[in-house]
C-alpha cells in the first residue's frame, strides 16, 4: 500500500531523527534521503552536511517549498557520503542523480527531446547520424547539439553526405561487394575496406569542423587543397573540392546570427520568469555562429532565478554525454558557489571553463538577445497554457464535472478482421500529450480471433488490465476520492500521478457500456469519470444517458476530446501495423522445414526483412548465429528451388 503510517516518517520518530542528526558531520558531501521501502526520494549536496540536513527538520522552518515539504514527510532514513571538497560533492551529486533519478530531484524538463548529431569515433570507420539518445561519457564518440530544428539538421546532414563521401550504413549490405552508394560516389567503400581508416578520418574531420562552427577554417583548408589539385592538373578532383566549398557556403548563407569575436566558443543562458512559469534559453555559439539552441520550461515555480540557473547548469552539463563544454558560459546574473561550478565544469571539460556575467557591450548584448528569446518563449508557453485551460474548463462544463480534468486518458482498439488486436492508452496532462505515460496492449482474450472481432470485449480487457491494481488498492482500504487533491503527503507521488481525472473511449454507446461494465466489475464505476466520442458527427456520450450531449462543432472542450481521440487512434493503428508486419514476416518463414520461432527471430534480426533473406547466398545465411550449414541449405533452396547452370 502506498500509504505512510505514523512509524514510517522521521518527523514522527524523533528518537531516530535525533540519532541520525548526531552522526552527520559538518563536512562537505552528499546526502541521500529514503522512504520506508528504501526508495530514494532525494539527493542533495552541501559544504556542511549537518547544517543542511538539520534545516529540513526545523520545526519552525516555513521556507520549505510545498514540493520539498511533501518529500520531508516521507523521509525514513538518511545516508551521507563525505567528499574532500565542495566541487567534488557537486560532481558526485550530479552522477548520483543521473544514475538514480530520484522523484524529488526533477526540476526542469526540456520542452522537447531535442536531437543530437553523433560521430562514432570509437569505430574504425566512424558513422555520422542523428540521434536522441546518448552513450556513456567514457565513450570516444562525439555529440553536437542539441538542435531545435530537426528538419534543418536532416537537410544539413543530407547535403554533407552528398558533398563528402561518408559511410552510409550501420552495417554492410553485402559481404563480398559494395552497394549502390559506392557506385554513385556517396560512400568510399568502407564495407570492403577500399579506403584506409586514416584517410577516411581526414574526410570526417572536415565534416566535424562544420558542426564545431569552424566553417571559415574549413573553407580555407579546402581552397588550398583545390589549388594544389589544380597545379597537379587533377581538375576532376579540384572540381569536387570546389563544389564542396560552394555547398558549405550555401549551407550557412541563412546563418544571420554572428558575433565579432569569431574565435571564441561559448554557451549563453537567458531566463524569463513570472509567478508560476520559468523559461530558460541556452544558445550554443561556436566560432561566432549559432549552432544549437535548447529551451527549458519549468512550472510550479519554487526557486529564485539564480538558483534556477544553477540547477540548469547542474542538470544540463551532467546529463549531456560527450558534448563539448565550451570554455566560456555567459549568464545574466551570478549564481551561488560560482567558483565551485567553474571548477566542476573545468574537470568535465578537461580544461578551464569560466562563468561570466558580462559587462562589455558585445557580450552583454548577446545575453540580452538570449533573454529576449526566453521572454518570447515564456509568452508562447503562457498563451498555450491559456488555450489549454480554456479547453479544459469548457470540457468540465460540457461533462458537468466537479473539477477540471488535469489528466485525461484516451483508449482505442485496432485490428484487421480480428487479427493482431491491440489497444492503446494515450495521456493528456493539462491538455498536452504526455507520451511518457502512453501504453500499448496486445489483446490476450482467446475469444477474439481471425474473423471473430469484438471491440467491446477488447476494450473491457484493456480497462481491466489498466485499473486492476487500483481495484486492489480500494479493496485494501484506500479512499480513491482523496486522489483528487494530488498533494497528499500520505501517498507516493508516483502513484498519485497515475490516477486519471477522466477517461475517454473512442466509440459510441456500445463501447461506453462495455467500459462501464468493466469498471463495475473492478468496483471503480463510481470513482472514475468516463465519456465516449463517436466518430459519426463527433457525438459525446456519458454513462446514465442514452442521448448525446449538446455541443457545438468547434466548442473548445470538444476540440480537445477530438485531439485525444485522434491521438489514441494513431497510436493504436501504428502498433497494429507493426505487429501485423512482424506476423507477416514470420508467416513467410514458418513453413520452412527445421525453422522454428527462435531461428526466425535470428534470421530477421540479422537480415531485417524476408526480401533480404531471399536475396542472400547460402554462405550468408549460414553465418547467422544458431544456423548450421544444413539448415542454411534448406532455407536457400526454399527460396531458390531451381538453379540453372550458365554455360
Curated annotation (Swiss-Prot):
<keyword id="KW-0742">SOS response</keyword>
<feature type="domain" description="GIY-YIG">
    <location>
        <begin position="26"/>
        <end position="106"/>
    </location>
</feature>
<dbReference type="InterPro" id="IPR035901">
    <property type="entry name" value="GIY-YIG_endonuc_sf"/>
</dbReference>
<dbReference type="InterPro" id="IPR036876">
    <property type="entry name" value="UVR_dom_sf"/>
</dbReference>
<dbReference type="GO" id="GO:0003677">
    <property type="term" value="F:DNA binding"/>
</dbReference>
<dbReference type="GO" id="GO:0009432">
    <property type="term" value="P:SOS response"/>
</dbReference>
<dbReference type="Pfam" id="PF14520">
    <property type="entry name" value="HHH_5"/>
</dbReference>
<dbReference type="Pfam" id="PF01541">
    <property type="entry name" value="GIY-YIG"/>
</dbReference>
<dbReference type="InterPro" id="IPR050066">
    <property type="entry name" value="UvrABC_protein_C"/>
</dbReference>
<comment type="similarity">
    <text>Belongs to the UvrC family.</text>
</comment>
<dbReference type="InterPro" id="IPR047296">
    <property type="entry name" value="GIY-YIG_UvrC_Cho"/>
</dbReference>
<dbReference type="InterPro" id="IPR038476">
    <property type="entry name" value="UvrC_RNase_H_dom_sf"/>
</dbReference>
<dbReference type="Pfam" id="PF22920">
    <property type="entry name" value="UvrC_RNaseH"/>
</dbReference>
<feature type="domain" description="UVR">
    <location>
        <begin position="216"/>
        <end position="251"/>
    </location>
</feature>
<dbReference type="InterPro" id="IPR004791">
    <property type="entry name" value="UvrC"/>
</dbReference>
<dbReference type="Pfam" id="PF08459">
    <property type="entry name" value="UvrC_RNaseH_dom"/>
</dbReference>
<protein>
    <recommendedName>
        <fullName>UvrABC system protein C</fullName>
    </recommendedName>
</protein>
<keyword id="KW-0234">DNA repair</keyword>
<keyword id="KW-0227">DNA damage</keyword>
<comment type="subunit">
    <text>Interacts with UvrB in an incision complex.</text>
</comment>
<dbReference type="InterPro" id="IPR000305">
    <property type="entry name" value="GIY-YIG_endonuc"/>
</dbReference>
<dbReference type="GO" id="GO:0009380">
    <property type="term" value="C:excinuclease repair complex"/>
</dbReference>
<dbReference type="InterPro" id="IPR001943">
    <property type="entry name" value="UVR_dom"/>
</dbReference>
<dbReference type="InterPro" id="IPR003583">
    <property type="entry name" value="Hlx-hairpin-Hlx_DNA-bd_motif"/>
</dbReference>
<keyword id="KW-0963">Cytoplasm</keyword>
<dbReference type="GO" id="GO:0006289">
    <property type="term" value="P:nucleotide-excision repair"/>
</dbReference>
<dbReference type="InterPro" id="IPR010994">
    <property type="entry name" value="RuvA_2-like"/>
</dbReference>
<comment type="function">
    <text>The UvrABC repair system catalyzes the recognition and processing of DNA lesions. UvrC both incises the 5' and 3' sides of the lesion. The N-terminal half is responsible for the 3' incision and the C-terminal half is responsible for the 5' incision.</text>
</comment>
<dbReference type="GO" id="GO:0005737">
    <property type="term" value="C:cytoplasm"/>
</dbReference>
<dbReference type="InterPro" id="IPR001162">
    <property type="entry name" value="UvrC_RNase_H_dom"/>
</dbReference>
<keyword id="KW-0228">DNA excision</keyword>
<dbReference type="GO" id="GO:0009381">
    <property type="term" value="F:excinuclease ABC activity"/>
</dbReference>
<dbReference type="Pfam" id="PF02151">
    <property type="entry name" value="UVR"/>
</dbReference>
<keyword id="KW-0267">Excision nuclease</keyword>
Amino acid at each position: 500500500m502506498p500509504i505512510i503510517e505514523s512509524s514510517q516518517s522521521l518527523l514522527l520518530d524523533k528518537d531516530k531523527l535525533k540519532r541520525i542528526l548526531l552522526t552527520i558531520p559538518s563536512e562537505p558531501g552528499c546526502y541521500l534521503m529514503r522512504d520506508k521501502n528504501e526508495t530514494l526520494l532525494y539527493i542533495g549536496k552541501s559544504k556542511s552536511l549537518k547544517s543542511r540536513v538539520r534545516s529540513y527538520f526545523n520545526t519552525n522552518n516555513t521556507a520549505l517549498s510545498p514540493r520539498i515539504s511533501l518529500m520531508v514527510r516521507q523521509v525514513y532514513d538518511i545516508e551521507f557520503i563525505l567528499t574532500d571538497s565542495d566541487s567534488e560533492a557537486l560532481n558526485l551529486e550530479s552522477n548520483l542523480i543521473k544514475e538514480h533519478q530520484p522523484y524529488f530531484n526533477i526540476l526542469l524538463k526540456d520542452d522537447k527531446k531535442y536531437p543530437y548529431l553523433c560521430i562514432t569515433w570509437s569505430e574504425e570507420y566512424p558513422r555520422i547520424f542523428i540521434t536522441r539518445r546518448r552513450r556513456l561519457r567514457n565513450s570516444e564518440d562525439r555529440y553536437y547539439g542539441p538542435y531545435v530544428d530537426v528538419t534543418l539538421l536532416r537537410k544539413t546532414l543530407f547535403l554533407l553526405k552528398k558533398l563528402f563521401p561518408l559511410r552510409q550504413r550501420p552495417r554492410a549490405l553485402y559481404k563480398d561487394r559494395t552497394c549502390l552508394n559506392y557506385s554513385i560516389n556517396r560512400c568510399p567503400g568502407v564495407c570492403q575496406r577500399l579506403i584506409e581508416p586514416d584517410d577516411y578520418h581526414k574526410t570526417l574531420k572536415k565534416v566535424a569542423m562544420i558542426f564545431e562552427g569552424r566553417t571559415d577554417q574549413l573553407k580555407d583548408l579546402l581552397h588550398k587543397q583545390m589549388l594544389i589539385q589544380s597545379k597537379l592538373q587533377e581538375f576532376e578532383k579540384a572540381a569536387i573540392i570546389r563544389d564542396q566549398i560552394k555547398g558549405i557556403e550555401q549551407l550557412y548563407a541563412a546563418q544571420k546570427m554572428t558575433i565579432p569575436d569569431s574565435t571564441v566558443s561559448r554557451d549563453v543562458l537567458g531566463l524569463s520568469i513570472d509567478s508560476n512559469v520559468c523559461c530558460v534559453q541556452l544558445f550554443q555559439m561556436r566560432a561566432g555562429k549559432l549552432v544549437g539552441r535548447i529551451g527549458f520550461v519549468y512550472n510550479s515555480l519554487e526557486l529564485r532565478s539564480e538558483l534556477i540557473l544553477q540547477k540548469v547548469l547542474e542538470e544540463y552539463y551532467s546529463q549531456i554525454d560527450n558534448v563539448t563544454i565550451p570554455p566560456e558560459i555567459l549568464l545574466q546574473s551570478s549564481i551561488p558557489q560560482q567558483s565551485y561550478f567553474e571548477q566542476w565544469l573545468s574537470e568535465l571539460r578537461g580544461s578551464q571553463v569560466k562563468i561570466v556575467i558580462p559587462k562589455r557591450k558585445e557580450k552583454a548584448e548577446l545575453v540580452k538577445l538570449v533573454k529576449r528569446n526566453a521572454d518570447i518563449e515564456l509568452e508562447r508557453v503562457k498563451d498555450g497554457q491559456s488555450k489549454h485551460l480554456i479547453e479544459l474548463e469548457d470540457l468540465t462544463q460540457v461533462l458537468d464535472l466537479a473539477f477540471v480534468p488535469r489528466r485525461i486518458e484516451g483508449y482505442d482498439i485496432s485490428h484487421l478482421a480480428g487479427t493482431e488486436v491491440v489497444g492503446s492508452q494515450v495521456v493528456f496532462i493539462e491538455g498536452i500529450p504526455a507520451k511518457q505515460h502512453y501504453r500499448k496492449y496486445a489483446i490476450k482474450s482467446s475469444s477474439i480471433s481471425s474473423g471473430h472481432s469484438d471491440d467491446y470485449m477488447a476494450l473491457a480487457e484493456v480497462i481491466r488490465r489498466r485499473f486492476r491494481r487500483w481495484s486492489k488498492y480500494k479493496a485494501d482500504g484506500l479512499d480513491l476520492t482523496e486522489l483528487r487533491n494530488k498533494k497528499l503527503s500520505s501517498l507516493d507521488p508516483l502513484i498519485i500521478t497515475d490516477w486519471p481525472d477522466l477517461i475517454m473511449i473512442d466509440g459510441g454507446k456500445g463501447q461506453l457500456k462495455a467500459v462501464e461494465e468493466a469498471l463495475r466489475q473492478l468496483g471503480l464505476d463510481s470513482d472514475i469519470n468516463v465519456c465516449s466520442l463517436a466518430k459519426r458527427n463527433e457525438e459525446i456520450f456519458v454513462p446514465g444517458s442514452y442521448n448525446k450531449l449538446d455541443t457545438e462543432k468547434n466548442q473548445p472542450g470538444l476540440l480537445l476530446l477530438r485531439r485525444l481521440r485522434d491521438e489514441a487512434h494513431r497510436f493504436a493503428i501504428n502498433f497494429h501495423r507493426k505487429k501485423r508486419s512482424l506476423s507477416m514476416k514470420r508467416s513467410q518463414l514458418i513453413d520452412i522445414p527445421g525453422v522454428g520461432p527462435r531461428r526466425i527471430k535470428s534470421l530477421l534480426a540479422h537480415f531485417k526483412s524476408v526480401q533480404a533473406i531471399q536475396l542472400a547466398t547460402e554462405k550468408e545465411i549460414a553465418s547467422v548465429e544458431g544456423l548450421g550449414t544444413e539448415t542454411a541449405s534448406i532455407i536457400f533452396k526454399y527460396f531458390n528451388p531451381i538453379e540453372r547452370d550458365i554455360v
